[in-house]
């Protein structure tokens, strides 16, 4: 069995530790060169959790501390000549989660203390904003060089309570106070870098820093974090080959599997494909493809929001949106779309420059399967053993193209769903239908547009395309007739596959499928 060529820094986010210990590092220092050449002073970057933000922040810290030896052989080594040593204040707020006001104040106190030990503290500096301002000014005075402030995961203290107004207000006031000196400290600052997941406009960062560059949606920074397809197929190719060998695949087959599981992120209109770095590195190191990112912890705030806004997973694929509908503050949102995008559960799939319209979708199989697993208890039987038994029989029927048997399995299973989990809308049954088929890893799309309407679901099999129409308390014949009347089959006539239309009737009283009609087109 082929050996792993690269030594991967699994769980390590400190640049100096990676470089000093010979761990594999994908050079991202060209982006620091770009910052310096453009004389950028305040930069904000939004990316999902575990996507490399902290490593990039650590890289910036090492650069501004003038640690030239760590950058030998990297892009910035050819650019930087002076390697000035600036005082760097690096605040990591990722640990400030699930806190009340007292705990958050204590956390900020512990973050400030090391710098006060280094640069001193004056009487009267009591509140975090006063202490931060004093530290920066003294650091500048004592070293003769402007300070650098790095704030990693600036929004972490607020995300878990974003849906709880009473709890959010006191925490937001504390963080607003902490960040408030940044604007007036401009004469003492060389650079300020802030990372997070979403935007809280009232935290003074966005409302007061007029020269803040939010690079989150810029094409040139789309791969500032994460791993691009080019980086995988060049620097990491030997280990992808080794993974393929371990899994009994060719390199091309392994690359396809890695792409399906971990690729698909796009952070701008013309973004290159970006792989989830956490999952990709874990997979190459462990020689196993698994849901590492999703399995590392779905944020509780996300599940609460999915519940609050009654998210229909079926509607997330192919969601059309203008920029302001997903690039907005979580405090201003009226649905879950902004947070789903900013948290990495949706990504940009397509951009129409004429209408400035984005098409959003779930990035890859890891995220899709993870969302399905998280949401299915809200729609079907919470008992995992019952779900597994049903899915096994259902799966076998679908894969042998026996839709009759598959729907019979579904009818029996749906009758067991607890009544209190249900509502009786057509959307609800459509979502259950979508969840069932999606678990089989079949390519299924819901509400697919035709020239004069939308099919409820389209399922692509190797030799057959199924078009489904679902009706609640109406006949299966009516559902079948709508497929013909609306021309739902027309887009697929040129594909050379067998075309089958399926009309399904749900009985809201019996809480299951009452009838279906299957007809080849």
Predicted features and spans:
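Structural motif
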Residues: 148, 464-466, 500
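Domain-level recognition of nuclease-like catalytic cores that cleave nucleotide substrates
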Residues: 491, 495-521
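Short beta-strand or tight-loop elements
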Residues: 451-455, 497
């Amino acid at each position: 069995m082929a050996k792993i060529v690269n030594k991967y820094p699994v769980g390590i986010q400190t640049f100096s530790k990676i470089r000093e210990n010979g761990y594999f590092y994908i050079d991202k220092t060209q982006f620091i060169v770009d910052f310096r050449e453009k004389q950028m002073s305040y930069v904000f970057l939004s990316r999902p959790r575990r996507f490399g933000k902290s490593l990039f922040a650590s890289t910036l810290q090492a650069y501004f501390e003038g640690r030239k030896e760590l950058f030998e052989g990297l892009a910035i080594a050819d650019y930087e000549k002076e390697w000035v040593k600036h005082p760097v204040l690096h605040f990591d707020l990722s640990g400030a989660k699930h806190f009340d006001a007292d705990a958050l104040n204590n956390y900020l106190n512990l973050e400030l203390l090391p710098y006060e030990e280094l640069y001193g503290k004056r009487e009267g500096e009591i509140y975090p904003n006063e202490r931060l301002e004093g530290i920066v000014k003294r650091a500048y005075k004592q070293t003769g060089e402007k300070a650098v402030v790095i704030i990693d995961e600036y929004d972490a203290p607020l995300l878990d309570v974003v849906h709880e107004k009473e709890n959010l207000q006191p925490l937001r006031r504390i963080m607003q106070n902490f960040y408030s000196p940044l604007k007036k400290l401009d004469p003492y600052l060389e650079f300020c870098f802030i990372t997070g997941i979403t935007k809280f406009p009232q935290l003074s960062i966005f409302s007061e820093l007029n020269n803040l560059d939010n690079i989150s949606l810029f094409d040139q920074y789309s791969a500032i974090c994460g791993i691009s397809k080019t980086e995988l197929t060049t620097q990491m190719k030997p280990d992808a080959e080794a993974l393929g060998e371990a899994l009994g695949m060719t390199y091309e087959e392994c690359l396809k599997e890695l792409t399906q599981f971990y690729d698909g992120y796009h952070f701008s209109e013309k973004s290159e494909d970006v792989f989830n770095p956490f999952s990709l590195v874990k997979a190459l190191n462990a020689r196993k493809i698994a849901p590492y990112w999703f399995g590392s912890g779905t944020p509780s705030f996300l599940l609460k929001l999915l519940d609050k806004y009654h998210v229909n997973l079926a509607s997330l694929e192919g969601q059309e949106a203008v920029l302001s509908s997903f690039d907005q503050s979580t405090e201003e949102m009226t649905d879950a779309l902004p947070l789903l995008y900013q948290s990495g559960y949706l990504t940009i799939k397509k951009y129409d420059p004429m209408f400035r319209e984005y098409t959003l979708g779930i990035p890859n199989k890891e995220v899709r399967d993870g969302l399905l697993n998280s949401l299915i208890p809200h729609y079907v039987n919470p008992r995992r053993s019952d779900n597994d038994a049903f899915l096994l029989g259902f799966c076998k029927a679908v894969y042998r193209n026996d839709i009759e048997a598959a729907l019979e399995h579904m009818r029996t299973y749906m009758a067991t769903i607890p009544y209190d989990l249900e509502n009786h809308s057509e959307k609800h049954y459509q979502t259950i239908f979508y969840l069932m088929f999606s678990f089989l890893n079949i390519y299924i799309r819901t509400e697919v547009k035709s020239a004069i309407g939308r099919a409820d679901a389209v399922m692509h099999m190797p030799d057959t395309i199924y078009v489904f129409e679902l009706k609640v308390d109406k006949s299966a014949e009516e559902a079948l007739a709508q497929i013909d009347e609306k021309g739902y089959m027309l887009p697929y006539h040129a594909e050379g596959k067998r075309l089958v239309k399926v009309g399904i009737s749900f009985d809201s009283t019996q809480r299951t499928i009452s009838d279906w009609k299957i007809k080849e087109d």
